[in-house]
């Protein structure tokens, strides 16, 4: 059949020996040692620029790297009156809360003034044009756009031409649908600018098992792109785990109060929770160091906690050392106890004592005859 497709046709395998490229997003580096933390404001400003500025400032003060918005053109995005949300008709909600291009421009300027990157999600190709005209530094798409390949084709063309990163959420879709989207970016020469975020499009997920954090590594290895986590859980545990598993971006909805009216407020982090998220992630990043060495603080413990070779009874000068007259004991200030094991025993066992050794003496190498 013309529409049939081999399950693995679009799958792209990543060479694990190849170093992952980092991407520049304004002053930020995506894919580097520091996780990029996105405060997803979305439409939680309720159509107010002043409220939006309060949100951006609060996100900045909490330590977020990015303030993310959404740009809606409802008449182009959707058919009116067809989608009912828990807060009313979606079309009407979008019309009521949307920002004009001038208002987005004002928010971009404000973000720049206070030192936080501006990011925005377009929901149709026309909105992509608006954002490109505004001079955005990157794009972010929602999970609902994953099968809108013309939308992604346009973003991919822009990305290939400009080098701008495109962050794509992967909630509520199949692996094959993700592969199709990746293929679009590959065909347009923009795959190296693509970031995929693992996501569950539940608000919030009703079980932690739905987070599917194991997909973080699978997305990276199958598609060879930088991977993040768009997290809709009500707390920070999933995000912490995602960072430990290699997520380079964490996105969480953000509000000044969960008590506000609107579709996203109740699942969003409040300022104190966002600060906890940032602080926790920064600590985890440090804890993920992979250089094995003995710290100064560890050495203090090592000195007493490790074991030395100790004489069981009195040993006379010239007497042969054996496992019958030596034993491992703390502290670790003498000959290491490993020299009593067969791996190293030939360097000590069978040698002669260089002096008389009282019982319970911690041996040093000076006590071993040359």
Name every feature range the model reports, one short phrase each.
Residues 5-370:
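Catalytic cores and adjacent flexible loops of soluble metabolic enzymes
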